[in-house]
Amino acid sequence: MDVKTYPVLEAAKNRTLVDNATYLKWYEESVADPEKFWGEHGKRIEWFEPYTTVKNTSFDGNVSIKWFEDGLTNVSYNCIDRHLKTHGEKTAIIWEGDNPYIDKRITYNELYDKVCRLANVLKKHGVEKGDRVTIYMPMVPEAAYAMLACARIGAIHSVVFGGFSPEALAGRIVDCESTFVITCDEGLRGGKPVPLKENTEKAIDIAARQHVMVNKVLVVRRTGGKVPWAPGRDVWYHQEIATVEPHCPPEKMRAEDPLFILYTSGSTGKPKGVLHTTGGYLVYASMTHQYVFDYHDGDIYWCTADVGWVTGHSYIVYGPLANAATTLMFEGVPNFPDAGRFWEVIDKHKVNIFYTAPTAIRSLMGAGDDFVNRSSRSSLRLLGTVGEPINPEAWEWYYHVVGAERSPIVDTWWQTETGGILITPLPGATDLKPGSATRPFFGVKPQIVDNEGNVIDGPADGNLCITDSWPGQMRTVYGDHERFIQTYFSTYKGKYFTGDGCRRDEDGYYWITGRVDDVLNVSGHRLGTAEVESALVSHHLVSEAAVVGYPHPIKGQGIYCYVSLMAGEVGSDELRQELVKHVRSEIGPIATPDKIQFAPGLPKTRSGKIMRRILRKIAEDDFGSLGDTSTLADPAVVDDLIANRQNRG
């Protein structure tokens, strides 16, 4: 296949922290002697007591991952206190509100004050080291304060995306037995209020029925809207922080003490609590932030993600603040008030580094070039993408139209589980190919295997594994180490299996081809097909459901649902709408089905397993090559699904 290559731009080459020769040298050192390499780079953060052990990891047997394990440090101290002498008056966070006329800047000195006060409020209400605190917030600075305050006192935060439903929030509260929730009266998205406190109330009731009692809710006032209130349990953030001291000593944390839990979708059942720890995570998040984005002091850096996702954790909060950067937090959406919003924000705040998702790029590309061209974007020098593979057409538009051919694009591949970027170009070192994540970051050892687990060398197409640990890697599934081993290390023994398909070309560049398990990637966010199926089946008229992904021009993957109804029930447009609403209320708007096809039967093997491969083909209108159907219990079901495929909406 003929692929255009874009050589490293002269401007990027001239200011880069890492040129190609340095990349090759460091990479070789990092995989040949990881102990020595990370022993050196672990010193990029400050330690109260230095580590003497660097790497103690095993991908075999009981799988154990430990980095810098005898060192003592604190993430909040590294993101704030250590910068105060030299960068105290520097802007730490630029907050751009949903309303284009509202913004504010928070300096590192102010950040220290806010985080210490909030840490003292947590302590006042009995939160101790190791306790789990749930954060269900919109994109406001207080969300970052809450994360850093937890880290300061050694509490473990579990941030839940503000777009998730009360049921999804409750599931996450119950799984980690969290008794303290931080939320807002309401969020604002695209000019519309989001009922966060009301959702929290419902979630607390659901959790209580499962014997997990939330005994304190700290509420940030964002809109001033009327919200349900439980005196004694609920307290206002603004009142509480006025009652405490503006200083709070950072807890000395072991490198392997938990920092946060973040729930992510799997191919089976309920979301997994991905557990990240303190030292290795911060070393990796800060190092990738510096070198992948070629961050120099004074750069204005904007990642458009939400703190409810791992990208927000690593590349809005922890990575940038550990590097004393100015990080922009955006409350709004790309198309409000119109599709020029991103580009206006770039001009307004003179953004140098811009990191967003292919979904947003595709949707803004569809809105036309005029919205882009009415801004200058002259401050931009680096573009990035994250969340899903970017199609070459969108890459080219991003490079030529948004970047005006002046900014390299770092197409970054990583996961909630990896803690930070694993495969990526480095702007001053890597020639670019549209659609390729290019080469591994330092210390990352990718391997492509076939379905039987045989290693394929050279140009290859197969399943992407990583053969050795890196400091940012998740340590376990919260409360379920067996599930951790089963999910990531049992498919290909002794290797971390990413769940992604991958192609490596003749230049050694990696091209991510998408999930190979039953996980959807919708608008850059992971969603398990099992989650959507169980939401559908919980509706009283549904007897069975199967969910697959199909190519979607904006979202990357759309959600296609095959639904079998209870005996005697008939599908209708009204029922279709009702099911869409039902799924949204069970999981959240992110899980909105794009197409629902009523199906009297589903294609199953004689052992009762649904043949999703066939369902995917029908969803994609590719039923000319269904492959081997000899194991089907009832082949007529497939003919019926094909004949009835117009019955989708």
Swiss-Prot record:
Mg(2+) binds at V537, H539, V542. This is Acetyl-coenzyme A synthetase. ATP binds at G387, E388, P389, D411, T412, W413, W414, Q415, T416, D500, R515, R526. Belongs to the ATP-dependent AMP-binding enzyme family. One of its GO terms (molecular function) is acetate-CoA ligase activity. InterPro entries: Ac_CoA_lig, ACAS_N, AMP-bd_C, AMP-bd_C_sf, AMP-binding_CS, AMP-dep_synth/lig_dom, ANL_N_sf. It comes from Sinorhizobium fredii (strain NBRC 101917 / NGR234). Keywords: Acetylation, ATP-binding, Ligase, Magnesium, Metal-binding, Nucleotide-binding. Catalyzes the conversion of acetate into acetyl-CoA (AcCoA), an essential intermediate at the junction of anabolic and catabolic pathways. AcsA undergoes a two-step reaction. In the first half reaction, AcsA combines acetate with ATP to form acetyl-adenylate (AcAMP) intermediate. In the second half reaction, it can then transfer the acetyl group from AcAMP to the sulfhydryl group of CoA, forming the product AcCoA. HAMAP family: Ac_CoA_synth. CoA binds at R189, G190, G191, K192, T311, N335, S523, R584.
